[in-house]
Amino acid sequence: YTGSVDSWLNKGSYSIDSPEKREALRNMFAKSQVALIYGSAGTGKSTLINHISNFFSNQKKLYLANTHPAVDNMRRKVTASNREFNTIASFISEKNQHTECDVLIIDECSTVSNSDMRKVLEKATFKLLVLVGDVYQIESIYFGNWFDIARNFISKDSIFELTHPYRTQNRNLLTVWERVRNLDIAILEPMVKSKYSVRLDESIFSHAEEDEIILCLNYDGLYGINNINRFLQNSNPSLAIQWGIGLYKVGDPVL
């Protein structure tokens, strides 16, 4: 398998500029038919899925995820042919009879419950299995710990972890992300030093940037989406239009 990947890459028709991803692709099926890919947001998990897909471009590939946004993301990122996308709910439904593929790829595995994963494995017929996700991201609504504990009993030859982030090269941000991810007790220091954390006051309602992003922890409460939206809308001079129980103005922020 590794020799086949090397030969494919040496032809020069397809390039992988990340040594980390190149090594993962070269080795993931060298000793196993199952590959588990772990990585935090921004480390290129979707990009690696695309690399795998292009190597197996002539094989039939099935891509599954728990949510429609995750499925749509794979559909946008994967450029290879012979592909089919579906949500897990649709795949395991009784109506679905399309269950055979050469390569089965499941994304955002941390959101997939143990029960649904078992149903997928029982229903699908495949030669190679690729499981992708981040155990620190959103958990399954129903009980689902299989992706977290799988690396404790699956062969190390089948486990690959992407660690290099691509969304920023800012060392201060990378330090904050790493400490948050690892629940490091020293998280406060870099947040204060780099001014990523400030005391909330009335200044948050003042327009400071043309391209502002507002993140709210919930819908209700003083700093919830609903209240923040009302404050910002009241300062918007545009004409208000009522639609149902809501008021909308041109120029309203999207929260």
Describe the predicted segments one by one.
Residues 111-113, 138-139:
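Catalytic P-loop NTPase motifs of RecA-like helicase/translocase cores
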